[in-house]
């Protein structure tokens, strides 16, 4: 039937200050691929705290959903992406050791997946943007589309945050990893992540697009600044050339992440050394 406009077919929001609501499917799928290859004891930890592992897979990105406008919670998420990750993981794992905190351990294993995938892929994604091939967020959401199609999901109808469970008890665990962000703000962020990513899935012939356009205009936002970043009905042509390299980086990161998560897992027993691979930023 009718060709749908870009705003009807995606789940990505950017406000006028430039905060990006990231795509989610690649991180979810990556976490499942890594989980399948982990030793049985690590799998057991994740199984017992699966909801926290799944939230962890989105790393600091959950904070991007706190509010559409600029705010300190979202800024904390932005700052985390620019900082070297090692100190965060060492501090988190020292708490796991001190308090025998298996829930926090599961969350940090998910967070480790997020860090490994971001730091493996972002240098290439950023280079494609700098060279004018394709904007960063457009390439990322097109990668989500490719992965959805490869795994039999329909990008227009699949709810990418279906595995995210917002609960105050989970927010309390996450707060132990990010003590500078209040528990209630973490809870709001996870709740908003689920709401917004699911809200933007196109399965209603544009009704939600019209609603969000009205909400944005009431808040003084430009609907155009949002709409230009939604997933389009057809694949974006500029994404085709860089896609094989991005897929290669993604695939290679899976076995690498399995090995480095095993290393992270050893810190539950003692203050062991974390290798240099943990000392990059989320941008590589």
Where are these regions (language model features)?
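Aromatic-lined, polymer-binding surfaces characteristic
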Residues: 113
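N-terminal leader/auxiliary helical segments
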Residues: 8-108, 116-284
């Amino acid at each position: 039937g009718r060709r749908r406009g870009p705003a009807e077919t995606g789940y990505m929001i950017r406000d006028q200050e430039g905060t990006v609501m990231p795509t989610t499917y690649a991180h979810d799928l990556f976490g499942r691929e890594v989980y399948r290859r982990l030793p049985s004891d690590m799998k057991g930890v994740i199984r017992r705290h699966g909801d926290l592992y799944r939230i962890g897979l989105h790393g600091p990105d959950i904070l991007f959903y706190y509010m559409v406008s600029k705010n300190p919670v979202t800024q904390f998420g932005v700052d985390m992406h620019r900082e070297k990750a090692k100190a965060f993981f060492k501090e988190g794992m020292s708490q796991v050791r001190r308090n025998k905190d298996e829930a926090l351990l599961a969350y940090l294993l998910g967070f480790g997946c997020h860090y490994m995938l971001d730091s493996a892929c972002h240098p290439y994604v950023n280079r494609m943007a700098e060279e004018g091939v394709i904007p960063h967020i457009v390439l990322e959401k097109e990668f989500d589309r490719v992965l959805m199609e490869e795994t039999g999901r329909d990008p227009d109808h699949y709810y990418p945050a279906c595995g995210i469970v917002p609960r105050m008890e989970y927010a309390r665990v996450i707060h132990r990893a990010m003590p500078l962000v209040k528990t209630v703000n973490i809870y709001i962020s996870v709740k908003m992540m689920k709401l917004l990513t699911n809200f933007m899935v196109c399965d209603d012939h544009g009704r939600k697009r019209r609603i969000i356009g009205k909400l944005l205009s009431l808040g003084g936002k430009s609907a155009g600044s949002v709409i230009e970043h939604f997933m389009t009905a057809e694949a974006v042509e500029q994404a085709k050339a860089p896609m094989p390299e991005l897929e290669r980086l993604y695939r290679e990161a899976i076995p690498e992440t399995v090995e480095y998560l095993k290393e992270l897992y050893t810190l539950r027993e003692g203050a062991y050394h974390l290798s240099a691979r943990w000392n990059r930023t989320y941008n590589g």
